[in-house]
Amino acid sequence: MSDGRVNADPQQEENMVKPPVKRSLTLLIVTYFFLFFGSIASSLLAKYYFVYGGSSRWVSTWVQSAGFPLLLILIYFPHYVLKTTTRRPFTRFTLRHLIFSVLIGLVLGFNNFLFSWGTSYLPVSTSSLLLSTQLVFTLILSRIIVKQKITFSNLNCVVLLTLSSVLLALDSSKDKPSGLTKTKYFIGYVSTIGAGLLFALYLPVTEKLYRTVYCYAMVMEVQLVMEFAATVFATIGMACEGGFKEMVKEANHVFTKGPTFYWTFAILANVVTWQLSFAATSGMVYLTSGITGGICMTALLAMNVIGGVVAYGDVFGGVKIVSTVLCIWGFSSYTYGMYMKMKKEEKEKGEYSGVKTTEDSGEMEVEMGNVKDDVAAADDRA
């Protein structure tokens, strides 16, 4: 870990070169693809654990962050195996980065715990629609923390998605699973809203932190520390509940699908897909902005609703249909507004802005400033 001193010439770090636009857009598209797959798969697998006999919210919390060692591949392979960069891992990773990453990671761990409570009681479709309320908090907190401009485009999107959740709340009595008490349903409802609030805080705070990093690899390093802290939080909770011995007992005697399905799908697949989702979220926030990342995730919640209906037979009545349409409408209007503003700005500039570069040990590192600056600018002016 660096002591914070920078060896490269500061003037070199401000150099701009003509952009490899396709590379920038490709990274953004690939990141969203992994977010798409990871978000939907992790939500369905999280419910899979509870549907077939799993009962520990701490286990459900633990699997959401325990896959952090997978990030070591993205961090170490480029330098030591692929030899595509001379930048050593954790170069310029300062004490400030470490402290903030740990603190954010602990908040993320508690967020995961609240999500687990909500998932254990609510249908996938219901919890997904409730989580869309995070956009209200994300917009407000982004305005406070990173000075995000409130425009017609993002405000319209937030209003539509919030209305979607309000409609769902008014129809909640018809959505309560049979055998579930009103108290437990209320706990699940409040826990899910709380998880949305904390995740809304997570997005702009990480955006502010990512403004102090200079390449995509550093984003993964910050994410590694965050997920490690979240895993420590969950592991302590598991230890108080019986630890891994309880997992073995649950796999062999409680889980109705048997130990093979327990370890393969309820645990391993959950670990991988959750890590994919969180890593892609971080990449999306870094390349664009916290509010854009939140809107992209919220758009996927509509797919989670459909996934819950298909995979678990969740009730999909008129209110949920309207709520889902509002989610899609809100995201589509925001995306279109952002796209039109980007085209207008590109036309005014006459060409794409440059890709910011830095130099480390004589070799150039490319930071995806092109996409980040263009999308953020469009978001501010949409």
UniProtKB/Swiss-Prot annotation:
Q: Where in the cell is it found?
A: Membrane
Write out the transmembrane intervals.
25-45, 62-82, 98-118, 121-141, 150-170, 185-205, 224-244, 260-280, 291-311, 315-335
A GO molecular function annotation here is:
purine nucleoside transmembrane transporter activity
Which InterPro entries does the entry link to?
PUP_plant
Instruction: Specify the EamA domain's residue ranges.
Output: 66-170
SUPFAM superfamilies listed in its UniProt record: Multidrug resistance efflux transporter EmrE (SSF103481)
Q: What's the superkingdom here?
A: Eukaryota
- List, alphabetically, the Pfam families matched: PUNUT
Region Disordered: list its residue ranges: 345-364
Question: Which Gene Ontology biological process is one annotated for this entry?
Answer: purine nucleobase transport
Give Gene Ontology CC terms: membrane
Entry keyword Iron-sulfur = no
Identify the keywords attached in UniProt to this record, alphabetized.
Answer: Membrane, Transmembrane, Transmembrane helix, Transport
- Identify its membrane topology class: Multi-pass membrane protein
Q: Which family does it belong to?
A: Belongs to the purine permeases (TC 2.A.7.14) family.
Protein's name in the database: Probable purine permease 4
Q: Which organism is it from?
A: Arabidopsis thaliana (Mouse-ear cress)
**Lineage, uppermost ranks:** Eukaryota, Viridiplantae, Streptophyta, Embryophyta, Tracheophyta
Which gene does this sequence derive from? PUP4
